[in-house]
From Swiss-Prot:
Gene: rpl24
Record key words, sorted: Ribonucleoprotein, Ribosomal protein, RNA-binding, rRNA-binding
InterPro entries: KOW, Rib_uL2_dom2, Ribosomal_uL24_CS, Ribosomal_uL24_euk/arc, Ribosomal_uL24_KOW, Translation_prot_SH3-like_sf
Subunit structure, interactors included: Part of the 50S ribosomal subunit.
Protein name per the record: Large ribosomal subunit protein uL24
Superkingdom of source: Archaea
SUPFAM superfamilies found in the cross-reference section: Translation proteins SH3-like domain
Family stated for the protein in its record: Belongs to the universal ribosomal protein uL24 family.
Gene3D superfamilies assigned to the protein according to its UniProt record, in alphabetical order: 2.30.30.30
Chain's role: One of two assembly initiator proteins, it binds directly to the 5'-end of the 23S rRNA, where it nucleates assembly of the 50S subunit.
Length: 121
């Protein structure tokens, strides 16, 4: 999704005030080379159930399934990407979708398959 304005101030304002139907598109991540060749699509919005690989940060190289997609904060939670709180409980570490790569798609939804076919054409 391309932002028309050049000023960083206005880009930040757009992301902060974006409606939920656009936030889903903003929460896109690139596909692995194998998936890219198979489906002919470069990136897709992340969904719960997708298997992703962390490409940046302290958890680089970790693979896991997406447990939650937080559209309000632009973050995702992945199995195996956790940290401990001071009381010892494990909580998911929030990741930005630009820092992960989709390794396996969750294709339980038939609409998603149609979206992929439409975008590949």
């Amino acid at each position: 999704m391309k932002l028309d304005m050049k000023q960083p101030r206005k880009q930040r304002k757009f992301l902060y005030n974006a409606p939920l139907h656009l936030r889903g598109k903003i929460m896109s991540a690139p596909l692995s080379k194998e998936l890219r060749e198979k489906y002919g699509v470069r990136n897709l919005p992340i969904r719960v159930g997708d298997k992703v690989k962390v490409m940046r940060g302290d958890f680089k190289g970790v693979e896991g399934k997406v447990v939650e997609v937080d559209l309000r904060r632009y973050r995702i939670h992945v199995e195996g990407v956790t940290h401990k709180k001071t009381d010892g409980t494990e909580v998911f570490y929030p990741l930005h979708p630009s820092n992960v790569m989709i390794v396996e798609l969750n294709l339980e939804d038939e609409k998603r398959e149609k979206i992929i076919e439409r975008r590949a054409a």
